Structures are given as structure tokens and as C-alpha cells.
A protein has these predicted regions:
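Predominantly five- to eight-bladed beta-propeller fold
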Residues: 29, 68, 100-105, 109-112, ...
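Non-catalytic accessory segments flanking enzyme active sites
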Residues: 37-40, 51-60, 73, 98, ...
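Blade-terminus and WD-like Trp-Asp/Gly-His loop motifs, strongest in beta-propeller folds
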Residues: 39-46, 86-94, 136-144, 149, ...
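Short, solvent-exposed loop/turn segments at conserved positions within beta-propeller repeat blades
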Residues: 54-56, 105-111, 149, 237-241, ...
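Short loop/turn segments that connect beta-strands within beta-propeller blades
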Residues: 65-68, 117-121, 159-162, 249-253, ...
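Blade-loop segments of beta-propeller domains
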Residues: 68-102, 129-132, 310-313, 323, ...
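Asp-box/WD-like beta-propeller blade repeats and closely related beta-sheet repeat scaffolds
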Residues: 107-155, 161-193
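Beta-propeller domains
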Residues: 206-365
């Protein structure tokens, strides 16, 4: 029997003439939750980096999970550069710094980019004109950067000889190379339309042609006088952007266009298999209920269909992920699909009526359904290919809670790793020995644990003080079951 749950709550109701919540309480942050803030995993280790601001600049610290020790790793001095956001290079010897960020659409932005070399403490602008760059990404070997300028062309910047190279030449307001337009940001939540090959030799990118998409007028009221702006907006029955895939061979200076099937109405994803030159791409029809995965054949310049997922309503698929390191697949936000080193595919589908993990051979033939039952898998948290273990989040016990589990590739040894009632999320260390577990419930404010891969709690990393709410006599939500006329 399926239940409908309603949350009945007046969380901020004051009882028995106890303290009342005022606007000042909100503005001065009387109520606050605790977390460990931003952190970046250190490669091949059980440690992560976090930052603290000082009078001199931004200090980076390394926290060791096993020993509970913290040491200062390096600093970026204000005298060198300030007011930036950052991301690490794949080898973690450099930082990509972004200044003057300006919002483009919902997820995308552009800005000025610089590279900070940690060892030499030096800053290099990304090209002689580092402004108005978007979708800037390191190559896997950390020696190059690819990016898109506001002319909607792809460019390459070699960090060894500080040389810039233009890779595409047909970019315009209508032709977008390496960066999706508004439609893909809204439909699929992504703006990134190019991928580096693992050996840094190739770039596969999507070319989006918006020529036949009609414009829609929007009024921007932020300025003193309203400004009319136009976006390419395909209404029902009107033309969508036309998309195509091209591959750039940076070493041999070759360019090829991939022959696509007629069903390639949307191309929501392109994927390089880890540690290989195998390329895959996904297509989706306009109704977004028929998804296909193709493996590209360099000899025939065509894609061979290996997976299909379809239903009568809608296919909800996130992009494939790539591993942080060979053998250990982990990302902070979780993922729904992965093509492993041996070519096997682990992916989440709702084809049996519930969201579950499936395992397929490199040619697409099924091996086994990993999880099953009348419950849902939310996403995959990490994959241990050596020991054939999948860590994932799901709702096996109840729809109103989310827990972290582990299971073998063959579907055996399903184990729940989090015991506390509530909602749990996880981020596994590169070694998969530990995971950071953020947790909260209707009665427990946000709390962060460090756990071993077995689920055993090592220590509390952050805990919200509940007493700050108690003085206001706050009530907590309660769940009740509401039955419909047919008993469901």
C-alpha cells in the first residue's frame, strides 16, 4: 500500500508566552546552523583542504581524517591577488582563480581568470586578455586550459609556453561552441558542452545552432530605466536548437564531425571512458521520454547504440560522472551513471517502476539489476571497482528518510550505513576509507559526522546548538498519513 505524507508544522510558533521571533532575529542571524563549510578532497588521501581568511590573504589548511590533525598547507597573499573564487587543477599543483564574476543564465557565468602556481606562488593571467571567459577547464594533465570567449568560440591556452590557440571559428550569437545556451541550462541544468579526453589529446564538443529558434522578449527592471532583452526561447511546437558533435585532435591538428542518428534531438551528455580514448554520447527525444546511449566508433565515425531507457512519461537523467582517480569513483553531489575502467556501465533507471541501479556489459547487454524492491535509489555516492562495492543514497525503509547504503556489484550484501532517523547525505574520501555524513531530521538540526566506510562514527565534525531554538518554545513537524477514497 502506498501512502501520502503531509508535514503538519508550525515550526516557528511561540508557545506559552515564551520568546517571540522578531525581524531582528532574522537579520542578525540569531538562529544559525553549523557545518564544516567548503572543503576539497586531497588526491589519493584521507584528507581535505579548507580555507580561512587572514589579514594577509586566503590560507589553505589540510585536515587529516585519520589523525584529526590540521596543518597549514599554503596561502594566497592579498599582495599577489585578492577577491576571487577558486578550483584546484587535477594534479592539485595549481588553482584556477576567477574574479569579476557576472551571471549569464541560471547556472552559467563569465569572468576574469588567472592561474595560481602553488609552488612558485605566482599568478598567470589566462591569455593576454583574461576577461569575459566562460566554462574554463583544466586539461586532465593540468598543463592546458580550454575556455569559451564571448564570441562563442572554443580556445586553448597552453600553460607551459603561455600560448593561446583558437579552436573553432564559426561562433556567433546563433552558433555556440563548447557552451550551451539558455534551453539546455533550463532543460538539463548544465552549460558545459565540451569534454577533455583522459589523455588530454582530444576535446569533444557540442555545437549548438540557435538560428531557427524564435526570440522572446524579457524586460530587465534592475536599471533605472527598463531594458528589453531577447533570448532564444522555443515554445511548444516551435524549432529547438540543432546540435551536433565534433572532435578536435589537438596533437595532430585534426577536426571531425560525428555522424549522429536522426533521434539526436537533444544531446544532454558526452562522455570519455576513463583511461581510454572511447567516447560515448547520449541522445534524448523532444518529449524527453526516450534516452539512448551510443559508443562512438572512430573508424566508421558513427555511434553504436548500447543502452536505451524509455517510458510513457519522462526520463530524468543526470550526466555521467568520471572518477577522481582510477579505481575510486566519488563526487560530492552524487551521480546516476558511470562507465567503468573495464567498460561496464552502472546506471540508475526507473524501468521497473522504481529508481534502481543496473549493471550492463560494455556492449550494453545486461549483467544484473543491482538494487530492487518497492523503494527508491536517489543517487550513487561512490564506487569501489577493486572490491566491487557501490555506495548509494536511498529510501529503502521509508519515503520520508534518506540513508546511505553499500551493496556489491552482484546485488548481494546490502547494508545500511547510517542509523539515525532523518535525511543523510555523503561525500567519500578519495581512498573510500571514510565519508563525511551531513544529517538532520525534524527534531535534530544539521549535524556533520565523519564515518568509516562501514558506517561507524569516528567523530562529530560540526553540530548545531539546539538550545538556541528551545528558548522560543518552538514546535516540531509531525507526519500523518492521509488516505484517499480508494484506500491508497
Amino acid at each position: 500500500m502506498r501512502y501520502k505524507y503531509l508535514t503538519i508544522a508550525l515550526i516557528f510558533s511561540a508557545l506559552n508566552a515564551q520568546g517571540e521571533i522578531s525581524l531582528e532575529n532574522v537579520l542578525d542571524r540569531t538562529f544559525r546552523t553549523e557545518s564544516i563549510g567548503r572543503y576539497d578532497w586531497k588526491n589519493s588521501s584521507d584528507a581535505y583542504y579548507f580555507t580561512e581568511r587572514s589579514d594577509e590573504g586566503l590560507d589553505f589548511y589540510e585536515y587529516n581524517l585519520a589523525s584529526n590533525d590540521t596543518l597549514k598547507a599554503f596561502s594566497v597573499q592579498k599582495s599577489v591577488i585578492s577577491d576571487f573564487s577558486y578550483s584546484f587543477s587535477p594534479d592539485q599543483t595549481k588553482l584556477l582563480l576567477k574574479k569579476n564574476s557576472k551571471k549569464l543564465w541560471r547556472h552559467s557565468s563569465y569572468g576574469s581568470y588567472y592561474v595560481y602556481d602553488i609552488a612558485s606562488e605566482s599568478v598567470t593571467p589566462v591569455t593576454s586578455d583574461p576577461d569575459s571567459l566562460r566554462n574554463v577547464k583544466f586539461s586532465p594533465d593540468s598543463n592546458k586550459l580550454a575556455f569559451v570567449r564571448n564570441d562563442n568560440n572554443l580556445y586553448l591556452f597552453d600553460l607551459i609556453d603561455s600560448r593561446e590557440e583558437q579552436l573553432t571559428f564559426d561562433g556567433s550569437e546563433d552558433i555556440l561552441n563548447g557552451h550551451f545556451g539558455w534551453v539546455y541550462e533550463e532543460e538539463f541544468g548544465t552549460y558545459d558542452s565540451y569534454k577533455w579526453s583522459p589523455n588530454s589529446q582530444y576535446i569533444a564538443f557540442i555545437r549548438e545552432d540557435q538560428t531557427y529558434v524564435k526570440e522572446y522578449a524579457l524586460v530587465d527592471y534592475e536599471a533605472q530605466y527598463p531594458v528589453v532583452k531577447y533570448i532564444r526561447y522555443p515554445k511548444t511546437g516551435e524549432d529547438n536548437p540543432i546540435v551536433s558533435i565534433s572532435i578536435l585532435d589537438l596533437e595532430n591538428k585534426e577536426y571531425r564531425s560525428v555522424h549522429l542518428p536522426e533521434t539526436a534531438y537533444y544531446i544532454p551528455d558526452i562522455i570519455w571512458q576513463v583511461n581510454s580514448s572511447n567516447l560515448y554520447f547520449a541522445t534524448l527525444n523532444r518529449k524527453q521520454n526516450d534516452w539512448n546511449l551510443y559508443k562512438y566508433d572512430f573508424d566508421t565515425n558513427r555511434g553504436d547504440l548500447i543502452l536505451n531507457d524509455s517510458n510513457d512519461s519522462w526520463i530524468d537523467r543526470d550526466p555521467f560522472t568520471v572518477p577522481g582517480e582510477i579505481g575510486t569513483w566519488t563526487t560530492k553531489g552524487g551521480f546516476s551513471s558511470a562507465i567503468l575502467e573495464n567498460g561496464e556501465i552502472l546506471w540508475i533507471s526507473e524501468k521497473d517502476g522504481f529508481s534502481h541501479i543496473y549493471r550492463n556489459r560494455p556492449d550494453g547487454r545486461p549483467i544484473n539489476q543491482v538494487t530492487r524492491g518497492n523503494w527508491e535509489v536517489n543517487n550513487i555516492s561512490a564506487i569501489d571497482t577493486k572490491n566491487e562495492i557501490i555506495y548509494f543514497s536511498g529510501k529503502k525503509e521509508t519515503e520520508t528518510e534518506n540513508h546511505i547504503y553499500s551493496i556489491k556489484f552482484n546485488g548481494s550484501r546490502l547494508k545500511r550505513l547510517t542509523k539515525e532517523k532523518g535525511s543523510h547525505s555523503s561525500s567519500f574520501s578519495p581512498t573510500l576509507n571514510y565519508f563525511i555524513n551531513s544529517y538532520s531530521s525534524f527534531t535534530v538540526p544539521p549535524k556533520t559526522f565523519l564515518r568509516q566506510d562501514s558506517g561507524k562514527i569516528v567523530r562529530v565534525l560540526a553540530e548545531t546548538d539546539r538550545s538556541q531554538f528551545d528558548a522560543y518554545g518552538l514546535t516540531y513537524p509531525q507526519l500523518i498519513n492521509i488516505f484517499t477514497d480508494d484506500g491508497t
